[in-house]
Amino acid sequence: MSWAGPEEIYLSTSLASYLDRKLLVLLRDGRKLMGTLRSFDQFANAVLEGACERVIVGEQYCDIPLGLYVIRGENVVLIGELDTEREELPPHMIRVSEAEIKRAQKVEREASELRGTMRKRMEFLDFD
């Protein structure tokens, strides 16, 4: 049994262990990006190759291709490796076109705004 020295511990906790692997990156604004990590720096700025943005609305999803994509480190919330041998999504999810997912996002945003305005109008009733 060997003990991992400081170098091994440092490398296993850094982004170096994810180089050339397919990753899922969750950003502060809620976007989900997928791609292969090609480079990074000390500020966690990262370069994804073959990147795409996965947009999910209800049971519909769309992968919007972005190509080579640079991510500013301060916007990263979470980085995780994708298991290439497992299904990425549950079987009930339906793949749709970019135009369809944009329409679905707009409808969802409008419904959310309507709920917010209704909540403000009913605030005086003090429901919680």
UniProtKB/Swiss-Prot annotation:
* Keywords linked to the UniProt accession: Cytoplasm, mRNA processing, Ribonucleoprotein, RNA-binding
Which SMART domains does this UniProt record tie to the protein?
Answer: Sm
InterPro entries to which the protein is assigned, alphabetical: Lsm1 (IPR034104), LSM_dom_sf (IPR010920), PTHR15588 (IPR044642), Sm (IPR047575), Sm_dom_euk/arc (IPR001163)
Question: GO CC annotations?
Answer: cytosol; Lsm1-7-Pat1 complex; P-body; ribonucleoprotein complex
Domain Sm per the UniProt entry, residue ranges: 10-85
Q: SUPFAM superfamilies attached here? A: Sm-like ribonucleoproteins
Phenotype upon knockout is: No visible phenotype under normal growth conditions, but the double mutants lsm1a and lsm1b show severe developmental alterations, such as delayed seed germination, reduced root length, epinastic, chlorotic and small cotyledons, small and serrated leaves, abnormal venation in cotyledons and leaves, dwarf plants with early flowering, short siliques with reduced seed number and small morphologically alterated seeds.
Annotated localization: Cytoplasm; Cytoplasm, P-body
What is the top-level taxon of the source organism?
Answer: Eukaryota
Q: Name one Pfam family in it.
A: LSM
GO MF? RNA binding
Its BP terms in the Gene Ontology are: cold acclimation; deadenylation-dependent decapping of nuclear-transcribed mRNA; hyperosmotic salinity response; mRNA processing; response to water deprivation; RNA metabolic process
Q: In which tissues is it expressed?
A: Expressed in roots, leaves, stems, flowers and siliques.
Function summary: Component of the cytoplasmic LSM1-LSM7 complex which is involved in mRNA degradation by promoting decapping and leading to accurate 5'-3' mRNA decay. LSM1A and LSM1B are essential for the formation of the cytoplasmic LSM1-LSM7 complex which regulates developmental gene expression by the decapping of specific development-related transcripts. Required for P-body formation during heat stress.
Q: Quaternary state and partners of this protein?
A: Component of the heptameric LSM1-LSM7 complex that forms a seven-membered ring structure with a donut shape. The LSM subunits are arranged in the order LSM1, LSM2, LSM3, LSM6, LSM5, LSM7 and LSM4. LSM1B subunit interacts only with its two neighboring subunits, LSM2 and LSM4.
What family is this protein classified in?
Belongs to the snRNP Sm proteins family.
Name of this protein: Sm-like protein LSM1B
Which source organism?
A: Arabidopsis thaliana
